[in-house]
Amino acid sequence: MSKPAAAAPSDPSKPSKPLKEVPGSYGLPVLGAVKDRLDFYWFQGDTEFFRIRMEQHKSTVFRVNYSPGPPGYPDSRGIILLDQKSFSVLLDNSKVDKSDTLLGPYIPNLAFTGGYRVLPYLDTSEAKHTAYKDLIFELLHVNSSRIIPEYNKVFAETAGSWEERIAKSGKAEVFASSDSMITKFLLRTIVHKDPAEPGPASLGPKFRDTYQLWTGVNFAGIAHTPLPHFLEELLFHTFRLPPFLVKKQYKALANFYRTHATEVLDLAEKKYGLDREETVHQLILILGINARLGLHKMIPALIYYLGLLGEDFQAKIAAEVRSAVHKNRAQGEEGVNITTQALLEMPLLRSTVLETLRLTPSIFYIYGRAREDMVIESHDAAFQIKKGELLGGHQYFVMRDPEVFEEPHKFVADRFLGERGKAVLPYLVWSNGRETESPSSSNKQCPAKDVAELITMQFVAEMFLRYDSFEITKDSFINTTELNVHLKSLKKRSV
């Protein structure tokens, strides 16, 4: 039986555990950071890097140099939190400052975002954080009727391309194709324009490449690539790449939004008093990084786990999907059979999606700086933290905390069903906030959390309205840095 009560946070002013010094060392200046970076990216890998130190210090809280670090990046010294209890402080905006901590110790050159600090780098105390988050909430509301139909269309296009590739070469890759699908979906839904459609400011058929190149150079400091390690280290992790490398791509993105997102820009300017040009750059990152990468990474992970579970489990999901859709069949637009109500009546599918998010969240790291001196408790100790110290959590470990989750490393599709599921639901964090909490303009939780879950559920529902089952290739794999998944077969729906 799960033990969620063991992870309940206590009053930090009255620690119930023995107070200890935070273990760990940063090593020699610069050299210590370089050693940790080489271990992190090369010699050990990101999960082993933390696992080895957790065992060495016999603690889930310890000091570490975050990567990439000096000499080319700022001071990377911080404290890692690898259990549910200590990690909870990162979700408390009264305790941690999120200014410029999206990537931990550094923020990319602002030239990558038109010279503006965009929403993910803003703390909840900043007025623009509230204004831009309220704008996103309104965009989701006014476009709510477009979400399911637009997703249905892009799914049909993508599924057709998968079928063609399997027929031609025996397999279809999922990562890049789902990225293109999600990018199209977001821009059609929010901007009301297909990025590949010919015309003024079109991004053309290689719109994904434009976004991907800008993303890659922007976040090169934390990149994992297929390059030989010494090249990756030299090119990306030692010094920052200059923004001019993607000036052309970023200009194309900005022109697309200036030209086609006029309704959004009007709303931002007239209702929220936001600068029109700044909003262009906010949209590029909010839609192109936060929303795009968040939604896109869920798809290969879901296909992978559903593929491993096999045909019998897929049949259960298919039956649930088809029953709920039949009961709540949509009226109106031809070909769109799914409704929001139907999705809400698919509990096994929802649990499967949440379990995927537990094991493979879109972002594994959350950071923040202590607003004041405080005491943080883990399951077995308490630690004094100084104001300004950089705190980070790695969700690979937090979402596998054995004090909370039964068989924490195993994919359990029905984990979040029934009373057992209800008990552990508050400890699921994938959206920069707890599953049982709601995003607001005063917190850092993803504003589209609930919509993102429904969209991801819709993806699986679309799969089983079109197919009876599917298989993945034997060499498919996923981990914290790669989602290498290929479809081997798609068995068309028989009834």
Swiss-Prot record:
Its cofactor is heme. Signal peptide: none annotated. Its EC number is 4.2.1.183. Keywords: Fatty acid biosynthesis, Fatty acid metabolism, Heme, Iron, Lipid biosynthesis, Lipid metabolism, Lyase, Metal-binding, Oxylipin biosynthesis. Pathway: Lipid metabolism; oxylipin biosynthesis. It catalyses: (13S)-hydroperoxy-(9Z,11E)-octadecadienoate = etheroleate + H2O; (13S)-hydroperoxy-(9Z,11E,15Z)-octadecatrienoate = etherolenate + H2O. One of its GO terms (biological process) is oxylipin biosynthetic process. Heme binds at residue 446. The keyword Lipid metabolism applies. GO terms for molecular function: heme binding; hydro-lyase activity; iron ion binding; monooxygenase activity; oxidoreductase activity, acting on paired donors, with incorporation or reduction of molecular oxygen. Pfam families: p450. InterPro entries: Cyt_P450, Cyt_P450_E_grp-IV, Cyt_P450_sf. Divinyl ether synthase involved in oxylipin biosynthesis. Catalyzes the conversion of (13S)-hydroperoxy-(9Z,11E)-octadecadienoate (13-HPOD) to etheroleate and (13S)-hydroperoxy-(9Z,11E,15Z)-octadecatrienoate (13-HPOT) to etherolenate. Has no activity with the corresponding 9-hydroperoxides (9-HPOD and 9-HPOT). Belongs to the cytochrome P450 family. This is Divinyl ether synthase CYP74M3.
